[in-house]
């Protein structure tokens, strides 16, 4: 297994366990996920750790990612994952529904200096929203 694929699997393990004490080993100091730009200007391992905590807070401590497939090309890794969770925390203004859900995701990860630098992900928002019962937002959304 390549070092890049091993790093992506460590990323998945962090989301599954909530443990982020070693993320600087595989997350670049300038790591970014463009999906977070609306909420924060943070970068690097700190941003990644916040994202992991948000997933656990919003989708329960039992939330987990399952690897479906993983491929590598040069400085890029593409991971096909499924997120399983229960909606237990506020999400984009929607109160917790308590409902279980699962949703497929595609993650594209670019590596710089052997670490994950740029992370794009495309979750199945529509399918997840349906599984949550299509709740209406109750407040304006501001993710910390």
UniProtKB/Swiss-Prot annotation:
Identify the EC number(s): 5.5.1.23
Where, in this chain's numbering, is substrate bound?
A: 51, 105
Look up keyword Isomerase and say if it applies.
Answer: yes
**Which pathway does it serve?**
Antibiotic biosynthesis; daunorubicin biosynthesis; Antibiotic biosynthesis; carminomycin biosynthesis; Antibiotic biosynthesis; rhodomycin biosynthesis; Antibiotic biosynthesis; aclacinomycin biosynthesis
Name the chemical reaction catalysed here: methyl aklanonate = aklaviketone
* Residues of the signal peptide: none
Q: How sensitive is activity to pH?
A: Optimum pH is 7.2.
- The protein's enzyme class: isomerase
**Gene Ontology MF terms in the entry:** intramolecular lyase activity
Arranged from A to Z, the UniProt key words for this protein are: Antibiotic biosynthesis, Isomerase
Recorded hits in Pfam families, A to Z, give: SnoaL (PF07366)
* Job description of the protein: Involved in the biosynthesis of aklavinone which is an important precursor common to the formation of the clinically significant anthracyclines such as carminomycin, daunorubicin (daunomycin), rhodomycin, aclacinomycin T (aklavin) and aclacinomycin A (aclarubicin). These compounds are aromatic polyketide antibiotics that exhibit high cytotoxicity and are widely applied in the chemotherapy of a variety of cancers. Catalyzes the cyclization of aklanonic acid methyl ester to yield aklaviketone.
What protein name does the entry list? Aklanonic acid methyl ester cyclase AcmA
| The species this protein was found in | Streptomyces galilaeus
Which gene specifies this protein's sequence? acma
């Amino acid at each position: 297994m390549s070092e890049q694929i091993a790093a992506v699997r460590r990323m998945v393990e962090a989301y599954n366990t909530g443990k982020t004490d070693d993320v600087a080993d595989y997350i670049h100091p300038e790591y970014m996920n463009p999906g977070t730009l609306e909420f924060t200007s943070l970068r690097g391992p700190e941003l990644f750790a916040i994202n992991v905590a948000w997933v656990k807070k919003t989708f329960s401590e039992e939330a987990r990612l399952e690897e479906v497939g993983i491929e590598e090309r040069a400085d890029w890794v593409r991971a096909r994952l499924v997120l399983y969770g229960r909606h237990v925390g506020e999400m984009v203004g929607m109160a917790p529904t308590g409902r279980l859900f699962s949703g497929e995701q595609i993650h594209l990860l670019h590596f710089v200096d052997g670490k994950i630098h740029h992370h794009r992900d495309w979750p199945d928002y529509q399918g997840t929203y349906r599984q949550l019962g299509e709740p209406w937002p109750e407040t304006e959304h501001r993710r910390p």
